[in-house]
Each structure stands twice: as structure tokens, then as C-alpha cells.
Amino acid sequence: MGASAPHGAVDWSSHPGMAALQRLADSQTAGEQGPVAVAYSGGADSTALLLAAWRLWPQRVCALHVNHNLQPAAADFERHVRRVCADWGIPLRVCQVRPTPAPRDSLEAVAREARYAALASLAREAGASTVWLAHHRQDQVETLLLALTRGAGLPGLAGMPRHMRRHGIGFLRPWLDVDGAALRAWLDAHGVSYVDDPSNQDQRHTRNRIRHRLLPVLQESFPAFAQTFARSARHAAQAQALLEEMAQADLQTIGQPPNIRRLQALSEPRQANVLRHWLRQAGARQASEAQLQQALRQIAACRTRGHRIHLRVGQGYLWRQGEV
């Protein structure tokens, strides 16, 4: 679609995401002069982010591309990415991955984790401490709605975090408040090429059904729903951050591993909160609601030294040793 780079005079002030990046540029200290690493799939969103970053930091930007080899078009995506980066003169690093989920694991989740690991590895090779991701407001709304369908708690309702660390590398989403449709319209108006992933049309996936069936109905009934839903996600993120602070303080009180008597002195909601926090820190997979409730019942029943606890939590086990 169009040329690989903007044609004619470019009105950069009309780029929907430029203001957010400019604020980042204005807030940077003199010491922050490392590479600006952008995760670049070749799609519209990452193309818009790479182009905007290239405009602001032409000597520092680099592109990172992960080929998942999950569909026949993957090789075409990589060829497109290589051609665009060559046209723009942007350094590019590419990594090939082949996600192989275990029998009970989700291919989507395994592929996503493989992508983060690959991006972190590419960023280290490039000397970058942070990878920029092009998720926008509509992506955040889809994530929130997907979490609601799964009965998620605050961590899920908070949506995608603006900042996070994985595999020793920071990940930044500067455009969670930016309209994705406006980004695509800007690219089209300036003749910038991008690829459309055919898997995004596959409505066997829940996220795609939300995108193609639910969001248009919400848009028709509640035109400002994307802004208000994204605001709800920000409120949930703030509340979750507060719970994390409280859990860390409670963990200092009850010790690690938790002392049963000190844990019992907390209210049940605080027990649940600190147990989730401790299990995450211990590297356990997320406990189900049923598992957590069973753990709380057994903790409440511990009134003698001989009372034992042994139950499955996530993919591991929780048990009592002595007074712990």
C-alpha cells in the first residue's frame, strides 16, 4: 500500500502519536542517549511508531523484528520489514523463533513470551535498555474486554502496563492513549506502506471477535467508549499498584515464607492479596480463585501445631512446615 516512506511534504504535526513521543523526548536527560529500539512487525501500528521515532531520533533509532514462523505470510512480513528499513536507512535486527507449546499451553501465550524473550535479546545486542511497543488505545480496550470475559481481577482489568520489565529489559508503550484508527489514517494519507496480518481476521480467536463484532457495536452506541474504557484501565492499574505496595508491606510483617500466626492476624482480603504477591515472587504460576480460596480456608483452620497444609497452587504445591 503506497510507498515505503512518506511522499511529498510531511505534516509531522498531524501525526497522531508524535505529541506523546515529543513529551518523552522533552523529558529525557542528557545521559539518556542510547539506542531507541522499536519492535517492528511491519504492521500499521509499529510502522507509525518506527517512523515517528525515526523523525525524532534519526541517528539513534533501530528496529527489532521477530519472525514467529507461525504462518506462511511470516516470510513476506520479514522481507517487507527488511525492505522498509533499507529504504529508510534504519538499522534492523531480526530473530527467528519457533514457539512449541506444551500440550496444555496456549500457542498464543507461548508465542507472546517467545517474542518478548527474542526482543529482549535483540535489544541487548543493540545496546538498548528499553524496547518500544506500538500498542494503542484500541488494543488496551480489547485487552480490558478480554480480561472481563475471563473474570479477571485488578491485574487483568488494568490492561497492558505502560512500563514493564521482562528478561532484564524494559518495555515501554508510549501510545496507550493514542487512537489506532488515526495512526492508520495518517499512514494512508502519506502513502506509507505496511502489512496487514491475515491472522487478525481469524474470528476463531476471542480477541478478533471482540475487535470485529463487539467494538463496532460499542462505537455505535457509546462513541467515546474507547477513551472511557482506557480510563477505567488506568484507574484499575492505580488500584493494583496500591495493592502491590500493601502486599509488600504485609510480606515484611509476616515473613518469607509466611508465618501462619502473623498471616492469620490479617483480614482475609489482605491474606489473599499477600499470598498472591508472595506466590508471584516465588515464581509460582497464578493460583486459580478456587485454589486461593482453599488455601485461605486451610490457613484459617490452622489452630494447632500439628495442623498440616498441602495443596496444589498453580503448577506447584503449598505446604506447612513447623510454625510457617
Regions found by a protein language model. Give the residues of each.
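Internal, active-site/partner-interface "lid" segment
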Residues: 200-207, 228-237
